[in-house]
Amino acid sequence: FLAKKVAKTVAKQAAKQGAKYVVNKQME
């Protein structure tokens, strides 16, 4: 089903954003 595919893509993007946020926090 399409919605499941979209949800997976959104989750992947969120994880990427979250990782970037964590790295930025550690850099400070």
Swiss-Prot record:
Organism: Cupiennius salei
Modified residues (Glutamic acid 1-amide): E28
Protein name (record): Short cationic peptide-1a
Gene Ontology BP term (one): defense response to bacterium
Keyword Secreted among UniProt keywords: yes
Family recorded in the similarity comment: Belongs to the cationic peptide 04 (cupiennin) family. 01 subfamily.
GO CC terms: extracellular region
Tissues where this protein is expressed: Expressed by the venom gland.
Alphabetized UniProt keyword annotations: Amidation, Secreted, Toxin
Signal peptide span: none
A GO term for molecular function: toxin activity
Subcellular location: Secreted
